């Protein structure tokens, strides 16, 4: 039987009012708390008027559980009463609705009518540190700003529809070294989204001192709501405050905030990146939101494998925001070009430049294309382009953070770095406060059955139908009511339904206005971004009980086990229609389409929200519509991305696909890696495209052509070279060599550091050293031990040599380059017959294989090893022992979701029906 719960669904209107904050006050961009006066300050940016600061107050509060056993005030009721009187404490019993986890959780609310400091002191005087180890699950006190927003039901950015309406200032420094102790700032660029632009130059330390002071004066004059840089947390702010110290500037005096008695703080903080956490130093200036824009890109990169780098140059190109005349300067040349002020020819159409001494009269030969300028001017143009791109990247990637901050009762700085489970935690804490509810006892984290990820056909497949369920896990929760019992009012279900309905509405509006009003369409598209984050993070929060008090591993496992059953149901249905399943991953399956699929017809009956009654569906869409009508109820629905020309499945979670527009997507370390040598990346880009086009013969010819280039040392050094970043000073590196590993061995040598020592380089942290292996055997590593000493099988490349001639060729280790190359090609051979697999790869092009057209045909279903490909029955369709064990514990039939299907559905699965 299907589980039944009797909570009434909370209306979307109630949820919307709660999320947006019931208090109507608009234009709050920041909240500050003054500990000395126990006062809240609201910083507002009023359109047309500028900044305004208003004082307010609130009653601070704490959720507490059973403090017995903690010797609170030595268990003396008299002492507790005296302390309550002293600190203005009132205690309220919270509602639990008889729920066991709520009864065992934080069941009291403690408030201080005297202030936040007094609330904290009440606990400390009683011997309980609110943030101590023994009280961490007994006392919950939020920061004052979050308490204020929750208790007053206010939200940031109310009244602003778009991120661009808020005044944003970005800045960037140009320095002549990587560390403040080794150099100075010679240029500061400042730009806002409201048209302000300024470059402050400084030729010496005296001018540098003035430039830093002027930088803070500009901030004070403009009073932006948001201050951002790109990698500013690790670089720019560190430089500014270190140079202040070195130059003898009192940073607290020149950094003017919006409060005369407060300046800035710098504290260790954490950036949450999907399943990882990264440390950084948060700079905070009173009254402002200070962010590092790279954090938003890094967070996007953690969940989007298509983003290969978080570098500004790359990410601007990725979002198609690069200006055609963008000027680029290698970071190692910026200081030199600025200092020497040599003359250059600048191509104003594409941003490229050449030394004036090497070319004559380019402005006359190409009027309107070239102008003569100087190195320092190029640096200024480069800086301005950097700032413009920083604003564009901020607009693109922080739009979601801005909209999240308008719903989550916390600071913008925190929203920009917090994990998704914490988003739900903040919402549920606010809901519990509003409805006088206890906070549930936390559950422990346990192992449970995850999603179904299988590979059924390795190799090459054509006419690939890509199907995935629309928001599978959230839809399962809504349709089958899979929510924790401790959410006694049904808030999580109400919010999830609101988010889902609202996102669909925004997506439909974005599509509706796409042709007639691009700006309005983009606005609706942006509005659905944060909602997508909420929807997709619900399952993660539910499965993270150590963070999210309402987490429930039992419910999380029901979601994944039900998801597996829906995946099996979908596979059975489409196999009955002649499709062949290729690969599946949690919420979707790729199928190879049958012959004659274009003749499939189905008239929709409107039994699912994705199917229009009376509409005739053709081809694969007919089968998707029929499946939706028969099996999908409520929010559940199957989506199609259409039929894609081809795909190559190399291994589990390693594949290449070509979409209907010819765009190729690569997934997995077999064919995509940040550490891939450029010459191999270049080959794979073209080679994989040939294979996806089904042209095995051309791929084989291209392999031998490219192998010949590698063999004859005709590959440019820029593509063969390794790029290593300096992460240790030379002094620290030398110290490292004197230490031993845990096994008692000497520490390994680093080729780039050995080259720096050998060439007497004065390297800085962050410098990139390019070098080429020139050994004579494949086994020759970059550095080899020989007796007590070492042998360097590599040489260094000067970056300016490659700038002058990017196609420069030279000496490199051919056997090693070929071995590395062939290792990357081998996984691709899964698309070929055995004859090609056995005879294609050689280490000398003279020994190439010859293959017939028939032998070059691409295939699928033939793995290298037996375990490389899953079996349909045993590995996919059969329910695992772990799943059966869960369903037995739960008291549910594993096929309970079929209860919602249309009557007589059994015949629609043919031989694959489950009962």
Where in the sequence are the language-model features?
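DnaQ-like (DEDDh/DEDDy) 3′-5′ exonuclease domain used for proofreading
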Residues: 4-223, 249, 372, 385-408, ...
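Common nucleic-acid-contacting/processivity interface regions adjacent to the catalytic cores
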Residues: 5-14, 18, 333-480, 518-573, ...
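Short amphipathic alpha-helix segments
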Residues: 73-84, 560-577
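Active-site-proximal helix-loop-helix substrate-binding element of RNase H-like nuclease domains
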Residues: 200-202, 206, 223, 227, ...
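Short glycine-rich phosphate-binding loop at a beta-alpha junction
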Residues: 225-232, 579-585, 590-592
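Short active-site loop/helix that positions an aromatic residue
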Residues: 235-246, 470-484
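Cytochrome P450 catalytic domain signature, combining two hallmark sequence patches
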Residues: 248-255, 481-490, 604
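C-terminal, non-catalytic extensions of nucleic-acid polymerases
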Residues: 597-915
């Amino acid at each position: 039987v299907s589980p039944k719960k009797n909570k009434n669904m909370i209306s979307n209107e109630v949820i919307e009012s709660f999320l947006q904050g019931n208090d109507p006050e608009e234009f709050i961009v920041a909240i500050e708390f003054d500990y000395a006066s126990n006062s809240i300050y609201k910083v507002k940016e009023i359109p047309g008027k500028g900044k305004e600061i208003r004082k307010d107050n609130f009653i601070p509060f704490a959720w507490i559980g059973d403090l017995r056993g903690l010797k609170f005030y030595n268990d003396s009721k008299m002492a507790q009463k005296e302390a309550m009187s002293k600190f203005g404490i009132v205690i309220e019993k919270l509602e639990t609705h008889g729920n066991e986890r709520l009864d065992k959780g934080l069941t009291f609310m403690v408030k201080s009518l005297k202030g936040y400091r007094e609330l904290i002191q009440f606990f400390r005087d009683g011997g309980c540190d609110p943030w101590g180890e023994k009280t961490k699950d007994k006392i919950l006190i939020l920061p004052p700003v979050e308490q204020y927003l929750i208790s007053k039901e206010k939200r940031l950015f109310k009244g602003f529809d778009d991120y661009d309406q808020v005044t944003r200032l970005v800045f960037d420094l140009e320095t002549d070294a990587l560390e403040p102790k080794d150099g100075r700032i010679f240029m500061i660029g400042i730009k806002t989204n409201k048209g302000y632009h300024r470059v402050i130059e400084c030729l010496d330390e005296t001018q540098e001192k003035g430039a830093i002071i002027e930088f803070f004066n500009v901030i004070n004059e403009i009073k932006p709501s948001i201050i951002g840089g790109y990698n500013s947390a690790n670089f720019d702010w560190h430089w500014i405050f270190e140079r202040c110290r070195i130059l003898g500037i009192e940073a607290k005096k020149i950094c003017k905030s919006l409060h005369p008695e407060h300046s800035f703080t710098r504290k260790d903080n954490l950036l949450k990146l999907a399943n990882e956490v990264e440390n950084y130093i948060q700079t905070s200036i009173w009254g402002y939101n200070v962010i590092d824009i790279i954090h938003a890109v890094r967070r996007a990169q953690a969940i989007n494998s298509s983003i290969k780098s978080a570098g500004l140059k790359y990410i601007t190109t990725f979002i198609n925001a690069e200006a055609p005349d963008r000027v680029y300067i290698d970071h190692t040349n910026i200081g030199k070009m600025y200092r020497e002020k040599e003359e250059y020819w600048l191509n104003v159409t594409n941003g490229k430049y050449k030394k004036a001494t090497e070319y004559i009269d380019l402005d006359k030969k190409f009027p309107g294309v070239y102008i003569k300028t100087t190195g320092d001017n190029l640096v200024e143009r480069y800086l301005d382009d950097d700032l413009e791109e920083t604003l564009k990247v901020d607009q693109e990637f922080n739009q979601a953070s801005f909209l999240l901050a308008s719903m989550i009762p916390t600071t913008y700085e925190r929203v920009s770095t917090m994990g998704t489970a914490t988003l739900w935690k903040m919402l549920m804490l606010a809901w519990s406060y509003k409805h006088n509810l206890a906070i549930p006892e936390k559950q422990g984290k346990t192992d449970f059955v995850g999603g179904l990820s299988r590979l059924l056909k390795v190799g090459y497949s054509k006419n690939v139908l890509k199907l995935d369920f629309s928001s599978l896990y959230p839809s399962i929760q809504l349709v089958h009511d899979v929510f924790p019992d401790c959410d006694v009012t049904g808030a999580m279900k109400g919010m999830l339904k609101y988010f889902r309905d609202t996102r669909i509405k925004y997506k439909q509006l974005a599509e509706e206005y796409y042709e007639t009003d691009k700006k309005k369409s983009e606005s609706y598209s942006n509005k659905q971004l944060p909602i997508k984050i909420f929807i997709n993070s619900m399952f993660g929060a539910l499965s993270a009980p150590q963070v999210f008090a309402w987490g429930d591993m039992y419910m999380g496992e029901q979601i994944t086990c039900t998801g597996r059953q829906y995946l099996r149901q979908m596979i059975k249905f489409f196999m009955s229609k002649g499709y062949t399943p290729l690969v599946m991953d949690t919420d979707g399956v790729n199928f190879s389409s049958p012959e004659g699929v274009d003749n499939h017809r189905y008239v929709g009956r409107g039994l699912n929200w994705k199917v229009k009654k009376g509409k005739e569906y053709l081809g694969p869409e007919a089968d998707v519509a029929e499946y939706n009508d028969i099996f999908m109820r409520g929010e559940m629905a199957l989506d199609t991305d259409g039929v894609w020309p081809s795909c190559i499945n190399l291994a589990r979670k390693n594949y290449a696909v070509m979409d209907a527009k010819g765009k190729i997507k690569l997934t997995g370390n077999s064919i995509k890696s940040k550490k891939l040598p450029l010459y191999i990346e270049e080959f794979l880009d073209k080679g994989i495209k040939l294979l996806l086009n089904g042209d095995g013969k051309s791929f084989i010819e291209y392999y031998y052509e490219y192998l010949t280039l590698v063999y004859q040392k005709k590959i440019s050094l820029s593509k063969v070279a390794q790029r290593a970043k300096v992460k240790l000073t030379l002094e620290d590196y030398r110290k490292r060599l004197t230490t031993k590993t845990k096994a008692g061995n000497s520490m390994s040598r680093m080729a780039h550091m050995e080259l720096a020592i050998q060439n007497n380089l004065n390297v800085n942290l962050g410098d990139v050293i390019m070098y080429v292996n020139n050994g004579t055997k494949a086994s020759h590593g970059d550095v080899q031990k020989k007796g007590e000493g070492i042998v360097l099988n590599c040489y260094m490349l000067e970056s300016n040599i490659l700038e002058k001639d990017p196609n420069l060729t030279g000496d490199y280790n051919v056997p090693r380059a070929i071995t590395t190359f062939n290792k990357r090609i081998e996984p691709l051979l899964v698309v070929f017959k055995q004859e090609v697999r056995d005879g294609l790869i050689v280490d000398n092009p003279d020994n190439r294989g010859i293959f017939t057209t028939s032998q070059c045909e691409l295939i699928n279903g033939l793995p290298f090893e037996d375990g490389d490909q899953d079996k349909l029955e045993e590995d996919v369709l059969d329910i695992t022992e772990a799943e059966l064990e869960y369903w037995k514990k739960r008291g549910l039939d594993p096929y309970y979701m079929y209860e919602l299907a249309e009557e007589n559905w059994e015949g629609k699965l043919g031989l694959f029906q489950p009962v």
